[in-house]
Design a protein with these regions (language model features):
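Active-site alpha-helix of zinc metalloproteases
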Residues: 154, 314, 350, 358, ...
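N-terminal membrane-entry
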Residues: 293-309, 397-401
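Glycine-rich segments within core transmembrane alpha-helices of 12-TM secondary carriers
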Residues: 362-366, 370, 410
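Transmembrane alpha-helix boundary/hinge residues in polytopic small-molecule transporters
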Residues: 42, 319, 368, 372, ...
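Nucleotide-cofactor and metal-assisted catalytic machinery
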Residues: 22-24, 34-290, 375-400, 467-638
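Alpha-helical transmembrane segments of integral membrane proteins
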Residues: 1-22, 289-293, 322-349, 353, ...
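Short, strongly hydrophobic transmembrane alpha-helices
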Residues: 18-46, 50, 316, 359-363, ...
């Protein structure tokens, strides 16, 4: 231990004598280690971190495999549950000691005269019990709160409690108002619990039974027009002792046919019922929570970690070269110490201690840099309409990763120069006057290897950068099919206000008239979804014979003047106008891709018509094509 302390003190003195070299070395390592630690922190938050709950390894996600068939309100290989189907599964399952469901939404919140949007977690009665989460203050929602009539209250997340109530215990028992309905505050969740969805966090947890109170009438997922077609609940459970995922999936498979028969949507036709009854239940681990971000972000994050690792290797090769050059100027000092009886092992240890000090300093600075970079990356991908939250504490995993990088970098850039300097022949060096000529061939060969390594790694990075630049250039220069500049987007959500359709139309017309009257505004229009906003809606286009789906088509509901506003080129036909009312024949404007896909590439699509899916008992939905426009991007820029 004394020898180690002496080596470290000696290393500090030598580094202090060369402040310029030390600063450059520490900065180089800080950038390399910081970039790697930042990416690792993101990977840890998205893929590796387990939920802060009791025994997360025994939790399992229950999801529906829809066999890649979709219609109406569900689509894709994995689907959430409707409320009636969730009730059936909850009552019939025997694989879990406890099972729970949850949904998420953004609702209007009023507290103390302030009104804004809150992230609301709709939790079934056993949600917190299944997770094993205990309250930080007060009590959490229980099965007694999630009953018909829903007389229970709400729980606040710790962060929301701190923001809105300053962390005061007097918040318990107070009332908050969601969508105009008062609810008492029951408790506060622990500081480490942000929910079960990676990338999101909730503000308020409320029983599932309160959903019809919040979203009244036809808008409710439980008591609205189509509760059996509203897929909004995610389900998870805690496996019984001795049960595994395979056994749980097998047991759920035995109850699914009966559960599906009890919940067939009455609007489905024979084809829809056939596919609905073919659904199966699957299970997968829930220790890391629910996440759509995990599948989307994992590959890019691993790629970024690999590229940042190359940057660190280049930095280590560069520092090794600097240390070799620095060691050549100290050959006489080292030769004298060897001649006086100093052991080579002690000298190598002292030289390695300098490298270790540089690596530790670089790791410490890199840790601070990593915290800034990781949070900056999250802020970069987050938008006001789709905020992203990741729990990224600087815990033992991140510190261990940074410490491991410090050890690795010490070996990579410090070991070879230390071994080379510790093995110089003192007699030959002293005879030449210590001018650094001894062992020059070996030193230069090592330096050439390091330089070649730097060049090779730099070429790999350069090639990767060029590919990224080309992809970015393609995205930047791609014609989106509409004007990107000079367009202002504002959102109005009538569903939250429970405004009748007639009043919505009147309000919208008056609003557009006022906007068009503003000096500098050329035109204005409305649409359900603005271009490239990350959301989309589709409907099934059917053939005219058997009514079988030809495929899904993206759709949007727009006002007259929309294509003029976004400057999407009209190829033929006309725009919508005031005569295209709800009582008039249904009309549509299609794009080039629609014509190719569903109309066999017709040269003139004007006057043609197509049919979309309609529930049994309703009139067939036929649309006459009155216009055709140029293709444009809608969901994203890909």
């Amino acid at each position: 231990m004394n020898t180690l302390l002496q080596n470290l003190r000696y290393g500090l003195r030598m580094l202090a004598k060369s402040p310029g070299f030390s600063a450059v070395a520490i900065l180089t390592l800080a950038l390399g280690i910081g970039a790697n630690a930042a990416i690792f922190q993101l990977i840890d938050a998205v893929r590796l971190r387990t939920l802060p709950v009791n025994d997360p390894s025994t939790l399992a996600i229950v999801h529906i495999d829809t066999k890649n068939w979709g219609s109406g309100n569900f689509n894709g290989p994995y689907s959430e549950f409707t409320f009636p189907l969730w009730q059936q599964v909850e009552q019939r399952q025997q694989a879990f000691s406890s099972i729970a469901a949850w949904g998420a939404d953004r609702d209007n919140l009023a507290t103390g005269g302030e009104v804004d949007m809150a992230h609301v977690l709709y939790a079934s009665g056993d949600f917190f019990r299944t997770l094993g989460v205990s309250p930080f203050l007060g009590r959490l929602i229980s099965a007694a709160d999630d009953q018909n009539g829903c007389a229970g209250g709400v729980d606040l997340s710790y962060s929301f409690w701190q923001r809105r109530y300053g962390g005061t215990a007097s918040a318990i028992g107070k009332t908050i108002t969601l969508e105009g309905h008062p609810f008492p505050i029951l408790g506060v969740t622990p500081p480490s619990f942000y929910g079960v969805s990676v990338g999101d966090r909730f503000d308020i947890a409320i029983p599932v039974c309160a959903e019809p109170i919040i979203h009244q009438g036809q808008f409710s997922f439980i008591t609205g027009d189509r509760p059996r077609e509203s897929w909004w609940l995610s389900v998870f459970g805690r496996l019984k002792p001795g049960w595994n995922l395979q056994r749980a999936t097998a047991q759920l498979g035995t109850i699914m046919p009966a559960a599906l028969h009890e919940t067939i949507p009455p609007q489905y036709d024979a084809e829809g019922v056939k596919h609905y009854l073919a659904f199966t239940l699957e299970t997968r681990p829930a220790a890391n929570g629910f996440s759509s971000m995990r599948d989307d972000a994992s590959d890019p994050l691993w790629l970024l970690l690999g590229l940042s690792g190359l940057v660190l290797l280049i930095a280590c090769a560069n520092l090794a070269n600097l240390l070799l050059a620095r060691a050549s100027s100290r050959e006489r000092e080292i030769a004298v110490r060897l001649a006086l009886g100093a052991s080579r092992g002690r000298l190598i240890g002292q030289l390695l201690s300098e490298s270790a000090l540089l690596a530790v300093a670089g790791a410490v600075c890199g840790g601070f840099l990593a915290a800034v970079l990781s949070h900056s990356l999250v802020a970069f991908i987050s938008t006001p309409g789709n905020p992203v939250f990741l729990d990224m504490p600087t815990d033992w995993r991140v510190l261990g990763f940074a410490g491991g990088l410090a050890i690795l970098t010490t070996i990579l850039f410090g070991l070879a120069p230390a071994l080379r300097s510790g093995n110089i022949p003192p007699g030959a060096v002293l005879k030449t006057g210590g001018r650094g000529s001894t062992g020059g061939h070996e030193r230069f060969r090592l330096q050439r290897i390091l330089v070649a390594s730097q060049v090779a790694l730099s070429l790999v990075l350069l090639a990767s950068a060029l590919l990224f630049v080309r992809s970015l250039r393609n995205l930047m220069t791609r014609d989106p099919g509409f004007q990107e500049n000079g367009i202002l987007v504002a959102n109005v959500d009538f569903t939250r206000l429970k405004v009748p359709d007639a009043q919505q139309e009147l309000f919208t017309r008056n609003l557009l008239d006022r906007i068009r009257a503003i000096p500098g505004v050329a035109t204005a229009a409305t649409s359900n979804r603005s271009p490239v906003n990350g959301s989309s809606s589709n409907d099934w286009v059917l053939d005219d014979k058997g009514g079988h789906p030809n495929g899904a088509s993206w759709e949007d509901y727009i006002s007259p003047g929309y294509f003029e506003t976004i400057e999407n080129a009209k190829l033929m036909g006309r725009d919508f106008n005031s005569t295209d009312s709800a009582n008039a024949p249904k009309v549509a404007i299609v794009n080039q891709t629609f014509v190719k896909k569903f109309l066999n590439g017709a040269k003139d699509s004007i006057g043609m018509r197509f049919r979309v899916w309609a529930p049994p008992g309703q009139q067939p939905r036929y649309y006459n094509i009155v216009g055709e426009v140029k293709d444009s991007v809608y969901n994203d820029m890909h």
